[in-house]
A protein has these predicted regions:
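Compositional signal for N-terminal targeting/processing segments
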Residues: 1-271
Length: 271
């Protein structure tokens, strides 16, 4: 599970995400997790099979006024459709666009006679999650809203991943705001619950790999260009396997240092 933490609508980061997805896709991956609601992602999956861009245009009409409405995302999706046509999107956020895309998807399923389907039930749950989140937010309970959403994102991700695991053994990739992807991070608003990636790491361990794209590659020495997964290191004349755990942006307090990268060295005892 490769997680990439972005600054939303940052063109350079989105270009990196596309490159990473194309690499994983070429290696056989097909499942891309997004910071979107379930219904929103399902409608994007329908667009992937469509001959025109009607559904994509409806998506961007719905999300106008948000960071997700940036044209850089439209380009991102169109390049995925062109270069990685078998991509399947998985939306694991609450359904922020429940008044538009959420009910649009429910209406579609109803017309198809699928009101009793698992897809309908999951879309409805995502909508209900959003309603509860905004009930907290509109009441001025921002901390409660943030905690609730973070837990929903983790639970929804686990549900989708576990369902995939039951069908096939495959790598997946996820694109989320960087506040959700630190393996040791806490929720943004009040830091009282583990963030999404932290919760995933607690359940799946080193299967979860995370990179914060806010740490610009140009600011890192060439030899530290990220390597996903694992590599070998020589320590005291012996070769060991090191597992990549993720990165942390430390620029705010470390002066010229942009970030630090964490590796776990297997079976290495130093005396």
């Amino acid at each position: 599970v490769y997680l990439y933490g972005e600054e939303h609508a940052n063109e350079k980061m989105i270009e990196q995400e596309l490159e990473h997805w194309e690499e994983l896709y070429a290696a056989g991956a097909r499942d891309l997790f997004l910071e979107d609601g379930y219904a929103s992602a399902q409608l994007l999956n329908q667009w992937m099979q469509a001959e025109d861009d009607t559904l994509l245009n409806e998506h961007f009409k719905a999300v106008q006024g948000t960071m997700g409405g940036s044209e850089v995302y439209r380009t991102f999706y169109k390049q995925i459709k062109q270069n990685c046509p078998e991509t399947v999107f998985h939306g694991t956020d609450i359904e922020h666009m429940y008044r538009s895309l959420g009910y649009q998807y429910l209406t579609y399923l109803t017309a198809e006679g699928k009101k009793d389907s698992p897809e309908y039930a999951q879309a409805l749950e995502s909508i209900q999650q959003a309603k509860r989140y905004y009930s907290y937010s509109y009441a001025g309970k921002e901390a409660e809203a943030d905690v609730y959403r973070e837990n929903c994102m983790a639970e929804n991700f686990m549900r989708e991943l576990d369902a995939l695991d039951a069908e096939k053994n495959t790598d997946v990739m996820g694109i989320y705001g960087a506040v959700h992807t630190a393996l040791d991070g806490m929720n943004y608003e009040d830091g009282t619950v583990p963030c999404m990636a932290n919760q995933l790491y607690q359940k799946y361990g080193e299967r979860i790999v995370s990179k914060d794209l806010r740490i610009s590659l140009k600011d890192l020495p060439e030899e530290t260009t990220p390597v996903m997964g694992e590599k070998t290191l020589t320590i005291a004349g012996k070769t060991y396997t090191a597992i990549y755990l993720g990165e942390e942006d430390i620029a705010a307090w470390a002066g010229e240092a942009a970030g630090r990268r964490f590796w776990r060295v297997e079976d290495c005892l130093l005396y």
